[in-house]
């Protein structure tokens, strides 16, 4: 590195010595935790261990340049950085290994994630944003390789937006856009598509991202030569290198064991990103992995003796220690004193954490033993109870699972009889207290989880009939005027106002920062949205067609959908995804993969408006709450006429509430989205045969029918028909499961439910292709007629085809 890239920070020698010794203390503490943590897992006290050994030095250097307001989007090697910032104590480190779920104990995920997955709270216990501009922030880690990349783009771009826009309350989230997103990733994960897509987008957008690539030459057992062209990711990225004439990405390569070189590299990287908003990749080479990849296996299996000897010599902590001694900054005895003190502290923290983990479980064991002793009296020393007491007394290294297995196994042997009433109550109470620890916060649970007041849509006298897309456009106009922190971006969103003109002219009115075009890169469009939402903005990320959501499904599923759950409600990303879908033309422009989305995206609302007025109401509602959601507009409905509301931007709806569109007494027809128009047409035809069908618009698949309209309808019709243009068993299967298990509709049915869906293959092209691939009015009408034929075959003769 040249002198022009050196840090401008000035310290006197004593301050410098103190800082170096603090750094060594941090590095040694982190390693001591890793060593003892691995031992605890191998002893069976934890299920899995993955640690940051070998990455301590670059992380403690990053810590010097990580400022309040900054964000990290990293992975399961970043423990040293969290320790250096005071977010991860030695005790908390072991709480994670032991998966302690006691409230308020394990700070990262409340015991839901394996150790090594870190985060800091972004909201308080009431759901209000913390002052993020004054805090050092860490977005929640996740295990899938490179899954942390897409959101880096949005976290970094948020700084650019806060710098360009003067937003009310902007100081709560940003210091004039001076924040860096610090990204971290392992070398092998750079082979993933998310990595390259993010680097490309960062270079295009010019955002303050500093991405560290920790390169230890391996991806578990696979060497770099089998992972990356030329065996070096920085060589592969040379085409992205910025020049004096062209914007791009600054690429720095530095050895991970060289303390002074790391300081120079990160000083330069931080200054470039923070002041000029230029993305920087820091390729940290010659990293080692002293403990191997994880507790799942030993790296001695695949590394040569020569490689292992080199790793031992170039362990960054050892090199750092040797450098300190060579520079005369500390003596051997001084460093040994630091090491001995840390080893003692870490051992004590481990012991304390283990005792804290076991205490409530031991208490539950004593309670169960007392219950069993009462049960043995009630059953006259029944041998099954005696055996259960013996097994319970001999338990060693157990959790709640083993206690419940003993208790539940015993009560089943008595056919859940009265002898076990007290024991069954104990089981019930324990499950009730424990279930929320493992199953809460899939969705937002604070006062921002639902709109406060429902406002009906209103119309002026003689309100005009307009294309549906005009209703949507003018409603977006009202929303952008009301919400200065609202942004929308996606393919063709800006200049032409989206492919269906729902944003026509709005870029000219509100600017290219708020109404923005993007490249064809669905995964990072979602990543932009997640990152912006984490930083307090209100983004709408547009995926041009529903079929293209599949490009981003991994990011949506693993990151956005699980965010509230995996942080126990401490982080939220109220991203709105706008897309359009269902029937149009061709295999990839008329898909409706709702079943896949419903299974993969629990944690995200999935809203399915039948027209553009309903879509507008959904956007209006979503901006009043803090729940991520996908709104699927009806692709073939933009040119259909709708009445123009006169309270644009204000009317809303209870999300998840279904609506009865047509009353009837003979059967209940349930559907959503574009298909509803066909269902209504079929219901009209049925009426001509004196069959009165009740038509219900679900409006939302997640949440589903929160007002129980379907059960109320079935109480009078006793027949259920679900019409869906997904594949057989797709959304229709999900809807039926929800109704049978959650709403207990089975006793209301006099006939078997009828599911009408699309064919199992992709929809064929053309009008005839649509007719034979998706449910038609004829299909729906005939399926309903057949239900009535079963009831009254004399009045409704059988269809002969």
Name each model-derived stretch.
Residues 1-89, 462-471, 475-483, 492, ...:
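N-terminal amphipathic, basic-rich helices that act as targeting or association modules
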Residues 35-212, 217-219, 223-241, 246, ...:
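Cofactor-binding active-site loop characterized by glycine-rich and histidine/acidic residues
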Residues 56, 137-397, 402-403, 487, 635-801, ...:
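Thiamine diphosphate
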Residues 74-76, 146, 184-185, 211-215, ...:
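Short beta-strand segments
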Residues 129-139, 420-457, 600-606, 613-646:
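Helix-enriched interaction subdomains in cytosolic or periplasmic regions
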Residues 382-528, 533-535, 547:
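Non-catalytic terminal/interface segments that mediate subunit docking, oligomerization
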Residues 571, 581-585, 589, 594, ...:
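Active-site phosphate/pyrophosphate-binding segments
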